[in-house]
Swiss-Prot record:
SUPFAM superfamilies linked: Glutathione synthetase ATP-binding domain-like (SSF56059)
Name of the gene this protein is made from: rimK
Superkingdom: Bacteria
Protein known as: Ribosomal protein bS6--L-glutamate ligase
UniProt domain ATP-grasp: residue ranges: 104-287
Length: 300
């Protein structure tokens, strides 16, 4: 099988592991920078080019598309989809997951419990917005943020108003969310592949911080999750139509709450913490689904 990995940096842990796992299972792998792909969009003979050459058909494509290049990255992935390549996460699902507001609306519509969340455009609504989520302390998030960047804990109402006004001054879209104090700076990252949680870790914020992201200095340990948490993680990934997802869960007094669904979860922290070959599980999922029948069905 020929597999393309779409990534700006093939030296990153996740890309290297996916390449290694695919090669170990006998596949040919090429890592492509999506920003160096260019496309001929033609009803008679669509094609995709890379650094001066027309690319051959790939049986499958693994998108490792960063938030900053979501627009062009998903456009390149769509072109591969048009040509019959099986995507490990479809372009439309990635774009959907990158929109935090839309994601939360979809999850809420499916009855998945979330932290109480509000959004407003007008500065006149700031006070009501704070009251809507239960007052301070609360969390203010940039809709476009990632890896814990653009996330602020406002411990007082005055601080909340100041942060919201500052973000609005940057013409940024923001979410205001209740602070789950009982989570104590911890969350659970569930790695979902297909209809299975293949690994789970607890991420704990470093002392003096509340964000548990490993990129922000958090620590990780193996997590034992409940059946309810497992079912919620799978349902959240399915709601977003993602074959592979990192589902972040907060343990609140009222039950598990989904905080975020990540369409391109990093493998380093969770593989090194659990010792589980997640990259191999992702490749095996591709083997089961990137079939000749799929290629013919999609016109490749």
């Amino acid at each position: 099988m020929k597999i393309a990995i779409l990534s700006r940096d093939g030296t990153l842990y996740s890309c290297k592991r996916l390449r290694e796992a695919a090669i170990q299972r006998g596949h040919l792998v090429e890592i492509l920078d999506p920003l160096s792909c260019y496309m001929n969009i033609n009803p008679a003979a669509s094609s995709i080019y890379y650094k001066g050459r027309k690319l051959p058909h790939f049986d499958a494509v693994i998108p490792r598309i960063g938030t900053a290049i979501t627009f062009y990255g998903t456009a390149a992935l769509r072109q591969f989809e048009m040509l019959g390549s099986y995507p490990l996460n479809e372009s439309v699902a990635i774009a959907r997951a990158r929109d935090k507001l839309r994601s939360m609306q979809l999850l809420a519509r499916q009855g998945i419990d979330l932290p109480v969340t509000g959004i407003a455009h007008s500065p006149d609504d700031t006070s009501d917005l704070i009251d809507m989520v239960g007052g301070a302390p609360l969390v203010v998030k940039l809709v476009e943020g990632t890896q814990g960047i653009g996330v602020v804990l406002a411990e007082t109402r005055q601080a909340a108003e100041s942060v919201i006004d500052a973000f609005r001054g940057l013409n940024a879209h923001i979410l205001v969310q209740e602070y789950i104090k009982e989570a104590q700076g911890c969350d659970i990252r569930c790695l979902v592949v297909g209809d299975e949680v293949v690994a789970a870790i607890e991420r704990r914020a470093k002392e003096g911080y509340f964000r548990s992201n490993l990129h922000r200095g958090g620590a990780a340990s193996v997590a034992s999750i409940t059946l309810q948490e497992r079912e919620i993680a799978i349902k959240a990934a399915r709601t977003m139509a993602l074959d592979v997802a990192g589902v972040d869960i907060l343990r609140a007094n009222r039950g598990p709450l989904v905080m975020e669904v990540n369409a391109s979860p990093g493998l380093e922290g969770i593989e090194k913490t659990t010792g589980i070959d997640i990259a191999g599980k992702m490749i095996r999922w591709i083997e089961r689904h990137a079939t000749t029948e799929y290629c013919l069905k999609t016109g490749g």
